[in-house]
Amino acid sequence: MVAQYIGRFSPSPTGPLHAGSLVAALASWLDARAHAGQWLVRIEDVDTPRCVAGMDRVILQQLAACGLHADQPPVWQSQRTGLYQQALDQLVVQGLAYPCACSRKDIETALSRLGQARARHGELVYPGTCRTGLHGRVGRAWRLRTDLFKQNKPLATVEYTQEATNLIACNIIHWTDRRLGAQQQDVPAQVGDFVLKRFDGCFTYQLAVVVDDAAQGITDVVRGEDLADNTARQILLQQYLGLPTPRYLHTPLVLGAHGEKLSKQNGAQALDTTEPLAALNHAARVLGLPACSGSVAGALEAWVEAWDA
């Protein structure tokens, strides 16, 4: 039996939605409706130190003002940490996760000694210092071994998405994005063993999103292009955990006046929902859809008909 389409929008309550996040929300909602599927909302508050109290309610109100209503009650990652611990425990038992004692300075020093002192999108490529043990130091975090997956055949996908082309060959992960086309990444070389649980006890986005997508039966992930770089890590985690890989569609970014990506970190203005149709029309144009007049409901219906991603 073919799985029903299930999509999701997963905002972090570190600030209100802005114009860029509405693009991802609208695209994921339209994709679900165009496929006669379900659209879920998940509040990604696993990074608790960065979350702002009450911001989850603000985000849900912004979505509602724009006519974007979930088909099930929202879920909060902060209430699901037991699931993430179970997944981490499974990886530890399999020898795929290990404790790490390294600070950022330790990693920079190790990379410098190797002549590889380089950062990728601000991230340091972890050199595997603690793979062989802590050597008397105290573990600060848990990392995933990225160099052990050798399968060279099509990967398991959700039944709905069997046409997706996914492959892991010689540690290089290949996948097809519905908008960006063929993609690949050598995770061990370009990312290194990445963190699953931080020194402060918080689980990372990579582990939480993989566990939640599987638990909620997500068939299609529609999100901003700034998150495309995470896809290979998530596919690797899915396969390590024996979870299906959904299809991925990464939407265009909204850029600021100087060409920078709009984000909460660089002070993007909160989404103004006093005129929701104006906000939605701006998001629709980014997605290549025509502007609509009239009601919000009428515009959403027209865009569902026009959606062909």
Curated annotation (Swiss-Prot):
Keyword Glycoprotein attached: no
Keywords on record: Aminoacyl-tRNA synthetase, ATP-binding, Ligase, Metal-binding, Nucleotide-binding, Zinc
Signal peptide: none
Gene Ontology CC terms: cytosol
Motif ('KMSKS' region): 261-265
Enzyme class label: ligase
Pfam family name, one: tRNA-synt_1c
Gene3D superfamilies attached to this UniProt entry: HUPs
Gene Ontology terms: biological process: glutamyl-tRNA aminoacylation; tRNA modification
Requisite cofactors: Zn(2+)
Chain positions recorded as L-glutamate binding sites: R8, F9, S10, P11, S12, E44, Y205, R223
GO molecular-function term, one example from the UniProt record: zinc ion binding
Physiological role: Catalyzes the tRNA-independent activation of glutamate in presence of ATP and the subsequent transfer of glutamate onto a tRNA(Asp). Glutamate is transferred on the 2-amino-5-(4,5-dihydroxy-2-cyclopenten-1-yl) moiety of the queuosine in the wobble position of the QUC anticodon.
Protein name (database record): Glutamyl-Q tRNA(Asp) synthetase
Natural source organism: Albidiferax ferrireducens (strain ATCC BAA-621 / DSM 15236 / T118) (Rhodoferax ferrireducens)
